[in-house]
Amino acid sequence: MECVFCRIIAGELPSKKVYEDEGFVAFHDIRPKAPVHVLVVPKEHVEKLSDYPDTEEGERKLGALFRTANRVARVLGLEGYRVQVNGGEKGGQEVFHVHVHVMGGWG
């Protein structure tokens, strides 16, 4: 298994998990850009955001990803937060497994 996030999901690599359910896992970023910086990762491997089909199923999966990001922010007690997705290499994506950055904890 080459994907670092798939290896974290499989328990092969350590992480500081803050949330997990049947479809997603969330853990602290190893190179945080904010006082609180968590990655929300679907357990299903999809390389980049644009790989989700423009169908009802794709919309359902993307909706679940962002609902989970909101849920994670609440679990962390963030009063305000930023959500960021880097789509593809030219969009700044470094790990090619869809993930959402939830960043907060300022001030």
Where are these regions (language model features)?
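HIT superfamily nucleotide-processing domains
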Residues: 1-107
